[in-house]
Curated annotation (Swiss-Prot):
Annotated Gene3D superfamilies: Spore Coat Polysaccharide Biosynthesis Protein SpsA, Chain A
CDD domains noted in UniProt: CMP-KDO-Synthetase
Classification via InterPro entries: Cytidylyl_trans, KdsB, Nucleotide-diphossugar_trans
Pathway: Nucleotide-sugar biosynthesis; CMP-3-deoxy-D-manno-octulosonate biosynthesis; CMP-3-deoxy-D-manno-octulosonate from 3-deoxy-D-manno-octulosonate and CTP: step 1/1; Bacterial outer membrane biogenesis; lipopolysaccharide biosynthesis
Functional note: Activates KDO (a required 8-carbon sugar) for incorporation into bacterial lipopolysaccharide in Gram-negative bacteria.
Family indicated by similarity: Belongs to the KdsB family.
A single cellular component GO annotation: cytosol
Any Gene Ontology biological process: CMP-keto-3-deoxy-D-manno-octulosonic acid biosynthetic process
Keyword ATP-binding: no
Enzyme Commission code: 2.7.7.38
Spans through the membrane: none
Taxonomic path: Bacteria, Pseudomonadati, Pseudomonadota, Betaproteobacteria, Nitrosomonadales
NCBIfam families assigned: kdsB, PRK05450.1-5, PRK13368.1
Organism: Thiobacillus denitrificans (strain ATCC 25259 / T1)
Protein name per UniProt: 3-deoxy-manno-octulosonate cytidylyltransferase
Length: 252
């Protein structure tokens, strides 16, 4: 299975400015993500950034980085520019690995790519993990997803879904039989669909939930959803997250 990885790495994070270059174990965070992508067996890995400092750090380590437009509203839009700049054929398999996931399991990256290979009628693939913790189920920063019988995503939300009308209240334990799923923010696409995505208008649902994958569902396309027993490792959104991940690296 051949696939490429693009790592969107935006410097100007509102909650943690300069996040891609945050030091973890003596190296910029983005290089740890890049290591994981290479361990997954990617044919190539490209860091797509909006800042020359990130580009310089990646290139100094001997890897490829592209300076992309600062006007992109999502990581997917940044991937579109990479696919166009590098002239990737339409059938090229591309996995979007978030630049703030220095502990991501390489096996998850491969699985996202495999999902798209297996489900040829999907334009996009992603992953999910069962939710067992009540706090995660009601946390808006933990994105939930529901799937149909065939394994395609029906909807993604920051709200608790599915909501069991008669068995759940916010102050009570979560019923385990509802099968709630936590979305793992990995996406696989074919380069041809990335070009199509660039022409799709953003949707009201996407803007409401602030979830870019809802644009794909809004326009009637299918997203394959692989459910994995592997729990996602903690990412880095805030200074507290960064301290937690640094501690995990120090403990290894």
């Amino acid at each position: 299975m051949h696939f490429r990885v693009v790592i969107p790495a935006r410097y100007g994070s509102s909650r943690l400015p300069g996040k891609p270059l945050a030091d973890i174990g003596g190296r910029p965070m983005v290089l740890h993500v890049l290591d994981r992508a290479l361990q997954a067996g990617a044919e190539s890995v490209v860091v797509a950034t909006d800042d020359a400092r990130v580009q310089a750090a990646v290139e100094a380590a001997g890897h490829q980085a592209l300076l992309t437009s600062p006007d992109h509203q999502s990581g997917t839009e940044r991937l579109v520019e990479v696919a166009e700049t590098l002239g990737w054929p339409d059938d090229t398999l591309v996995v979007n690995v978030q630049g703030d996931e220095p502990l991501i399991d390489p096996a998850l990256i491969r699985e996202a790519a495999r999902q798209l290979v297996v489900h040829t009628d999907a334009v996009m693939a992603t992953l999910a993990h069962p939710i067992h913790d009540h706090a995660d189920f009601v946390n808006p920063n933990v994105v939930k997803v529901v799937a149909d019988e065939a394994g395609y995503a029906v909807y993604f939300s920051r709200a608790p879904i599915p909501w069991p009308r008669d068995a759940f209240a916010a102050e009570q334990p979560m019923p385990h039989e509802i099968g709630a799923l936590r979305h793992i923010g990995l996406y696989a696409y074919r380069a041809g669909f990335l070009r199509t995505y660039a022409s799709l208008a953003s949707s009201p649902l996407e803007r409401c939930e602030m979830l870019e994958q809802l644009r794909v569902l809004w326009h009637g396309y299918r997203i394959s959803l692989g459910v994995t027993p592997t729990a996602p490792a903690p990412g880095v959104d805030t200074a507290d997250d960064l301290a937690r991940v640094r501690a995990l690296f120090a403990a290894v």
